[in-house]
Design a protein with these regions (language model features):
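N-terminal cationic leader/targeting segments used for protein routing and processing
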Residues: 3-7, 118, 147
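Short, well-structured beta-strand/strand-turn elements
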Residues: 65-74
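Aliphatic-rich helix starts adjacent to a transmembrane/signal segment
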Residues: 2, 8-61, 65
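Residue-level recognition of strand-loop junctions within catalytic nucleotide-signaling folds
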Residues: 19, 84-86, 158
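Type IV pilin-like appendage domain
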Residues: 73-146
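Short linear sequence signals and composition-biased patches located at protein termini or domain-edge surfaces
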Residues: 131-177
Length: 177
């Protein structure tokens, strides 16, 4: 075995073991941070998908509950969805149209256009990341049943790789003519 002289530089076994232990702790912490960042991004995308589905359904639900007349397109999506009603107290007429617009691949925005007393249309976007594409997942669509008077709304949103699908059944107020 070779002897080390006093001026000779090198690491002892204890120093190597301490360095290895520190390196292991740093690598473990780095790995945990990377996993947390990936999970956080996925959770954030999932929350965006849920919130967009809920927001779009909420607006359609509010208008559909008031509707005295519901019209859906005969296309596979059922859009545009047109809701008409007249208020009982003031006789104000409303026409609200929902349509899927501004496609970016399979993702659309849900546009709401409101016309009060045949006036100027007010247009807003009430939902984003609305999915209409090859299945799966299920496509966004709406259907009106003339027998049961129920509007069935299927909303699918996709944010990143996260997909959220919801089905709503809405029964508008009865029309008394």
């Amino acid at each position: 075995m070779k002897r080390m002289h006093k001026n000779q530089k090198g690491l002892t076994l204890v120093e190597l073991l301490v360095a290895l232990a520190i390196l292991t702790v740093v690598a473990g912490a780095t790995n945990a941070v990377i996993i947390q960042m990936m999970q956080s991004s996925r959770t954030s995308a999932h929350m965006v998908a849920i919130r967009q589905a809920q927001s779009a359904a909420y607006r359609i639900n509010c208008d559909a509950l008031q509707a005295q007349e519901v019209k859906v397109n005969n296309s596979s999506s059922g859009f545009p969805l047109i809701l008409n009603w007249t208020t009982w107290d003031a006789g104000t007429t409303y026409q609200v149209t929902y349509n899927l617009v501004n496609p970016l691949g399979d993702l659309y925005e849900l546009q709401r256009e409101e016309i009060v007393n045949n006036g100027t249309p007010l247009t807003t976007i009430v939902g984003q990341y609305i999915y209409r594409g090859p299945e799966p997942p299920r496509n966004t669509s709406c259907r009106w049943d003339n027998t049961t008077y129920v509007l069935t709304l299927n909303i699918t949103t996709k944010a990143g790789q996260e997909v959220e699908a919801r089905t709503y059944k809405i029964k508008p107020r009865p029309y008394v003519g």
